[in-house]
């Protein structure tokens, strides 16, 4: 599990689907996460169904942010924040073998617990300041270096990551770089080249 971890943005769904299709078609997206905080709960299942079809078409693992019930409805993996319930509970409700990730902020102790509970990967951030979560602060790369030395599961970095600033993050030990705006903040035409630029960082 290594490479670009793409997270959805708040574009209108048709535009988002177009962007996701060209991004996933590159064959260089490691995981896609559904995160649509501004979309009403009642509208989310139909969006997930459409995006799930794209992920199946391009053979990209698909996970749901925060919402275990939604993940369970579609038999998908889930990414859980610290306040989104226990990993063991998620593992009991989801199909065997799906991805279960955990936000660990800047804490190796939280990561240790998550891994003991069965997390597939652990995420640290925000590495850099970010408009998506301005309250998250920036943890820098030292915690990623330490996590890489301590843990066998993939380390995911998140927060303000771009092609230009992420080489050091990957060299520090991040197997996954979670990104929203550096891909989906661009036009559909620009996305494939940007995804490819990311992929070269992981070579």
Describe these PLM feature segments.
Residues 47-66, 88-107, 137-163, 198-203:
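Alpha-helix-loop-beta-strand connector modules within alpha/beta enzyme cores
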Residues 6, 82-90, 123-135, 166, ...:
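Glycine-rich phosphate-binding active-site loops on the catalytic face of alpha/beta enzymes
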Residues 73-75, 80, 102-149, 186-188, ...:
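Glycine/Thr-rich beta-alpha phosphate-binding loop at enzyme active sites
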Residues 1-16, 98-106:
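Active-site mouth loops of central-metabolism enzymes
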Residues 3-5, 30-33, 61-63, 77-79, ...:
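Structural preference for beta-strand elements that scaffold enzyme active sites
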Residues 20-28, 52-57, 72, 91-94, ...:
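Acidic (Asp/Glu)-rich catalytic clusters
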Residues 62-77, 90, 106-120, 150, ...:
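Catalytic cores of alpha/beta
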Residues 10, 36, 82, 104-106, ...:
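Short secondary-structure boundary segments
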């Amino acid at each position: 599990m290594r490479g670009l971890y793409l997270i959805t943005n708040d574009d209108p769904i048709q535009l988002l689907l177009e962007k996701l299709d060209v991004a996933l078609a590159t064959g260089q997206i490691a995981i896609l996460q559904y995160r649509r905080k501004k979309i009403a709960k009642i509208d989310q299942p139909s969006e997930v169904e459409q995006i799930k079809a794209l992920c199946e078409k391009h053979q990209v693992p698909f996970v749901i942010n925060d919402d275990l019930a939604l993940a369970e409805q579609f038999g998908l993996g889930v990414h859980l924040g610290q306040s989104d319930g226990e990993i063991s509970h998620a593992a009991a409700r989801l199909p065997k073998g799906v991805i279960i990730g955990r936000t660990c902020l800047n804490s190796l102790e939280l990561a240790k617990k998550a891994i003991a509970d069965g997390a597939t990967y652990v995420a640290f951030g925000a590495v850099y300041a970010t408009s998506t979560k301005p309250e998250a602060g920036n943890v820098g790369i030292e915690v990623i270096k330490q996590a890489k030395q301590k843990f066998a599961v993939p380390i995911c970095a998140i927060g303000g990551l771009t092609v230009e600033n992420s080489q050091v993050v990957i060299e520090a030990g991040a197997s996954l770089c979670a990104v929203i705006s550096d891909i989906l903040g661009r036009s559909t035409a620009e996305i494939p080249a940007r995804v490819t630029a990311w992929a070269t960082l992981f070579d």
